């Protein structure tokens, strides 16, 4: 999958832009705060119908304007052209059209335009709470498996309903039994698919970390869940119900799962240096790309947002060699340093385009 053209109106700091991209390498240069990340976020929005930066929709419409528009012209691996048109109005539902036909549900769009982004905000994957790491697993699986996405949506709806019931003075245990049985069914599917995903993902991640770091450091991932002992969630919920009534929320379930990230058998967030953390993160995201490529129908678009800062020259060279190989498709790279991008371009013989971005304006 590649994007050939992107047209932007009133998205964040970008008042208007018309971009035509290389099918291989696209370099975006500009100082911080000029709009490089906003352009990448527009691409992310077209794939996932939300910002990578987890900001609400009303914050992506340019200040003082009523609506933002994003239009992307794509070409899939069979050679077919596809137009996406997304309109965003604060306080209203987003409207997404594919080849002029509106989606009834935005969730039906997820996974058809695969994209992987590596950015400074992704440090929360290592340093943040467990919800960040669950989101990582969920995003990958939702792109590949509509049934997983459906199970996750239904589980979260039932979880919200159970939490509401836990706060009520009157306890309806019969209704709670039914609700917990349904949650157990969805949770089993989520747990099983997360477990298989990590089993498939781990060797890919290990190989990439070794390639980038050039060291024998042992890294690993460990998936922890209340369901790991084989007890159905409905039974766990029934046992925890008295405690949960006191707490006012559900204290067990797949919404509490954890993905531990380990360096030498210890949580990397406790011992990792800045360089080790960054290498771990980039390896995770490139492994996400590889996994999506292996298990999806289309090669994802890869966005690398200011990832070379604080990495030594050797690791930068290894990353460039990896993503410059034939296994990667269309790539977008941002940097504040024009010299860095010139060196990257010089190492590639691929078709490339360079864009300079200043105060929300994009120059090619």
Swiss-Prot record:
Report the source organism.
Porphyromonas gingivalis (strain ATCC 33277 / DSM 20709 / CIP 103683 / JCM 12257 / NCTC 11834 / 2561)
- Is the keyword Cytoplasm assigned to this protein? yes
What subcellular compartments does it reside in? Answer: Cytoplasm
The GO biological-process annotations, alphabetized, read as: DNA replication; DNA synthesis involved in DNA repair; double-strand break repair; SOS response
This protein's GO CC annotations: cytoplasm
What coarse category fits the chief subcellular location reported for this protein? cytoplasm
Q: What does this protein do?
A: The RecF protein is involved in DNA metabolism; it is required for DNA replication and normal SOS inducibility. RecF binds preferentially to single-stranded, linear DNA. It also seems to bind ATP.
Please indicate which superkingdom the organism of origin belongs to.
Bacteria
Record-listed ATP binding positions: 30-37
Q: Which family does it belong to?
A: Belongs to the RecF family.
- Which keywords appear in this protein's UniProt record, sorted alphabetically? ATP-binding, Cytoplasm, DNA damage, DNA repair, DNA replication, DNA-binding, Nucleotide-binding, SOS response
Q: What is this protein called?
A: DNA replication and repair protein RecF
GO terms (molecular function) for this protein are: ATP binding; single-stranded DNA binding
